[in-house]
């Protein structure tokens, strides 16, 4: 560790932060506004561990794992392009730190199955992803693997979307149960819900790679326009002359994220009086999205020219993550009598 990095670490005193993303496809506006912008700010004040959750990708995509390696490389490029700094944050791949799996296994010995079955996303994703067989332990147990991901680094805070809060609460319960059986090893982390955590997709549902409703960070200006100009709006506006209400319009949620107060006021007035159509309403929002993505995409192109950059970042991140993970697992094995 360099002197500059050590000084930086010492100045970031607000506790350890842990979060990850599954490499199941291109990152999109939901990731950017729901996680990545927040991560970039958090790395200034906290010791951050951000990981590519490739084992988590197998919980739903176990039958077709071929894209994980390339998706991992693309994800690291996106992270660097939006501003994550590998000299400040630990960026690593989950499967390269096997202690994640070991801690998950040990947790599985003490956690009741009903605790996993009651996690809301367990039923929700089964309903949303009906074309896949999700009757596996891996899918049932992925919130417990998340608990291992978090507790392995003794995180104080976990930045999540609102729908992931039950996973953090499960992690707190796991920590309490382990500590009750074996002594005080793990802290109880808190979930951080960030503003704009739930970004709507083009169909009005939460933006998700799985739903096919996402605007990718790598989409060029034409692709962004094509996708967002067709985004669903207030269903009452069947005709151009029908008035609507922005509070019932999924597209307006992107206005709230991207547009100025004056722009939102003008759009709101035009919608409620039917003085503008939905396509005209979306134009200013689309332009704002395009303007934000352009410099990110330029930085990404520059990074792509640096041969081996993703491998270098992941190798250094693995080294730093493994050092912490090994220390924690030494404590866990000792507490459980497994030394």
Positions of predicted regions on the chain:
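N-terminal Rossmann-like or analogous alpha/beta NTP/dinucleotide-binding catalytic cores
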Residues: 2-148, 297, 301
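A generic structural motif
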Residues: 23, 158-159, 213
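Conserved nucleotide- and phosphate/pyrophosphate-binding catalytic cores
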Residues: 29-31, 166, 172-339
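A generic secondary-structure signal for well-formed alpha-helical elements
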Residues: 76, 83, 111-115, 155, ...
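Classical nucleotidyltransferase
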Residues: 102-104, 118-127, 131-181, 185-203, ...
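Short helix-capping/linker segments at secondary-structure and domain boundaries
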Residues: 113-117, 152-159, 259-267, 297
């Amino acid at each position: 560790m360099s002197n500059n990095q050590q000084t930086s670490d010492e100045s970031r005193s607000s506790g350890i932060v842990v979060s990850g993303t599954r490499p199941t496809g291109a990152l999109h506006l939901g990731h950017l506004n729901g996680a990545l912008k927040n991560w970039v700010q958090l790395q200034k004040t906290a010791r951050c561990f951000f990981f590519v959750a490739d084992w988590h990708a197998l919980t739903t995509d176990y039958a077709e794992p071929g894209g994980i390696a390339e998706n991992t490389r693309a994800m690291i490029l996106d992270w660097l392009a939006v501003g994550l700094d590998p000299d400040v944050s630990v960026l690593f791949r989950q499967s390269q730190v096997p202690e994640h799996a070991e801690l998950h296994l040990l947790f599985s010995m003490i956690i009741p199955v009903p605790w996993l079955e009651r996690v809301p996303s367990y039923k929700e994703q089964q309903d949303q992803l009906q074309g896949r067989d999700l009757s596996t332990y891996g899918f049932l147990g992925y919130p417990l693997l998340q608990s291992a991901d978090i507790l392995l680094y003794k995180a104080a805070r976990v930045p999540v979307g609102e729908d992931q809060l039950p996973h953090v609460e499960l992690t707190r319960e796991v920590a309490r149960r382990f500590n009750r059986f074996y002594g005080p090893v793990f802290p109880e982390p808190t979930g951080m819900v960030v503003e704009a955590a739930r970004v709507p997709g083009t169909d009005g549902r939460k933006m998700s790679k799985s739903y096919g409703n996402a605007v990718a960070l790598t989409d060029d200006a034409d692709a962004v326009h094509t996708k967002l100009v067709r985004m669903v709006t207030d269903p009452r506006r069947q005709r151009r002359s029908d008035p609507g209400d922005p509070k019932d319009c999924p597209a307006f949620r992107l206005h709230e994220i991207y547009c100025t107060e004056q722009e939102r006021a003008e759009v709101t007035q035009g919608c409620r009086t039917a003085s503008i159509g939905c396509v005209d309403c979306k134009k200013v929002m689309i332009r704002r999205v395009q303007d934000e993505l352009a410099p990110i995409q330029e930085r990404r192109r520059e990074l792509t020219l640096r041969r081996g950059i993703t491998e270098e970042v992941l190798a250094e991140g693995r080294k730093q993550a493994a050092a912490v993970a090994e220390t924690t697992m030494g404590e866990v094995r000792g507490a459980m009598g497994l030394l």
